Amino acid sequence: MYGVCGCCGALRPRYKRLVDNIFPEDPEDGLVKTNMEKLTFYALSAPEKLDRIGAYLSERLIRDVGRHRYGYVCIAMEALDQLLMACHCQSINLFVESFLKMVAKLLESEKPNLQILGTNSFVKFANIEEDTPSYHRSYDFFVSRFSEMCHSSHDDLEIKTKIRMSGIKGLQGVVRKTVNDELQANIWDPQHMDKIVPSLLFNLQHVEEAESRSPSPLQAPEKEKENPAELAERCLRELLGRAAFGNIKNAIKPVLIHLDNHSLWEPKVFATRCFKIIMYSIQPQHSHLVIQQLLSHLDANSRSAATVRAGIVEVLSEAAIIAATGSVGPTVLEMFNTLLRQLRLSIDYALTGSYDGAVSLGSKIIKEHEECMFQEAVIKTIGSFASTLPTYQRSEVILFIMSKVPLPSVHHPVETGRTGENRNRLTQIMLLKSLLQVSTGFQCNNMMSALPSNFLDRLLSTALMEDAEIRLFVLEILISFIDRHGNRHKFSTISTLGDISVLKLKVDKCSRQDTVFMKKHSQQLYRHIYLSCKEETNIQKHYEALYGLLALISIELANEEVVVDLIRLVLAVQDVAQVNEENLPTYNRCALYALGAAYLNLISQLTTVPAFCQHIHEVIETRKKEAPYMLPEDVFVEKPRLSQNLDGVVIEFLFRQSKISEVLGGSGYNSDRLCLPYIPQLTDEDRLSKRKSIGETISLQVEVESRNSPEKEERVPAEEITYETLKKAIVDSVAVEEQERERQRQVVEKFQKAPFEEIAAHCGARASLLQSKLNQIFEITIRPPPSPSGTISAAYGQPQNHSIPVYEMKFPDLCVY
């Protein structure tokens, strides 16, 4: 019947006649607009016919494609587009099925023009907001086909560019159509993301090629519009901007895999650009998820080449800085923990020369300079990320890093690697470098918060080590914490300026919190400065750091008491150079003389006591004329000019404690304290830091003032503590520790080797002994209550306690309530 109707036009259904009428006899004439208006009006009037109209148009289009009548194909697609734009009703879902079938047919074609035509129609469809979603519609084919078009390798460059841009636009259309509708196909599934994201990144990689082919500035705007790289970037930004919390991981993982597969971490330019796009596109509250993904990827690549790991770390650095402006969530300490773990692994790799801990035939050979570059990248990342954190988080990070520094003790045996280096030493250096990066620029008004006791104790313990590099790092870290007004660079060179006003120092009055800090920790700081000055392995950088530390303490934390103590400390350093009990080299002795001259010149001008300034100036002038080797201008230069004999230093070349005490005492300073020579307090830190000499060959005079009489203060004779008494006390304590360790070893050995019956018998005997002791104690302490009538005499004339129950006792009326 339908076949007969097809022969006679008047008997054909109206929708078919309307569809046939929109096609002209010559396809070059284009769509017949008047007939198209009739078809549109009919579709709007009878929406139930839309599915039949779509099916018939699809039938004609498939036939025209097969017969290579591409003009009619274009007309059919134009008609479909107009119907889609005009019709918004519940029946459009059935029409869309026919439409998508025709688009898929065009995309399957090998003709680039048909592929582009189908993509453009799909993009128009994607921009239409449907009233009712379709539960059964699938876009899997379109994701696969558009992704394939993004990787087009057509011989013609212009056609290849058009196909790639069509593929990107198609992916953009799929994202727009599905991403906001939970009832549609879930575009965030890994099977889709693994195709979409790499396709966009592939086109982003070729941005340099596209820009290099731009022939002239006049054509630049047109070329920019045709640039697949920029279109891919916009699509990627749109995709990531729509990502919810649970979809971030699926979107980021393909990026990491793509960078791995194409070895794009090593140049790190493209990887950094990708993650900048990601960090600026996603919602700020989701930034920490990206950081977590990068940290996990870094751990997964812990055995990759150092250049790959360095690229990941630098990308992590850029991403972390951006994330810190938004929200980094709970990943702050996690990030630092991962970086420090990678730092320790890198040290192990550099020492062993292999990722497996031992060199074998199948193991990769590690290049030490690449591991050093990776370590520097990690330290730089730690510093750059820490600089974005608020003060309270930065303090936590500082304490966290310091807790990871291995302190030298009997519990940390020396470990050697291929080069004979100490693994602990390298770890200490790297962690102290990281700590220095974090502390640089750290601003904290309260020094008690910036340098808490547990942190300061651990830090200063490392300051007593024999390793010169570690000592220098500790000094630099202390300087970074104390310098709160940016004065550090003004003391980078040691000199005896006649007028320090040219330095333009920023000086504030010492706050109450700073005073409390110095009362608690000043002697500890002075002691470490004093001992650091006596190290014979010091070089010019050490003395510059010591000078900077002394100067910054004087500016940031000094009151009158601190000034007096610092002067005593520097005069004690001068005595070290003069007496030379440590047998220091000539350079070190001259450097100590020069250090003392530079600091006393500075502090005299800060105190503005004329007589003090005059004395310091006179000594400096005398040295300039007769002993320039005792001034920083001759010592701290590339080629120091030193004296061959320092044993005959005359008193005119020295700063005299009696003279300084006299002139400062007249200005209100504590002259009695100034007269006392500085003597460092000895602690157990020397033993913990493995120093060669634990005790110093000095005598400590300890004066104890009696506080019993408020009317009169009496002084008891000073107890003389000599080197021998100190040595005996330390040796005795060491012997006690050895005995305790031996006892513990015997107990452990007994429980490991003795039979169970013997151990059980021993424990049972101890339990019975304990019970008997308890019974004796109870007999002594628990007695019957005393008798109110006193004692009575028993037989043999012995007094006997007679106990009366409490409820039978007779109490006076006044005692009864």
Swiss-Prot record:
Keywords: Cell membrane, Cytoplasm, Lipoprotein, Membrane, Palmitate, Phosphoprotein. Widely expressed. InterPro entries: ARM-like (IPR011989), ARM-type_fold (IPR016024), EFR3-like_ARM (IPR049152), EFR3_Homologs (IPR051851). It is found in: Cell membrane; Cytoplasm, Cytosol. The keyword Membrane applies. One of its GO terms (biological process) is transmission of nerve impulse. Pfam families: EFR3_ARM. The modification Phosphoserine is found at residues 212, 214, 216. This is Protein EFR3 homolog B.
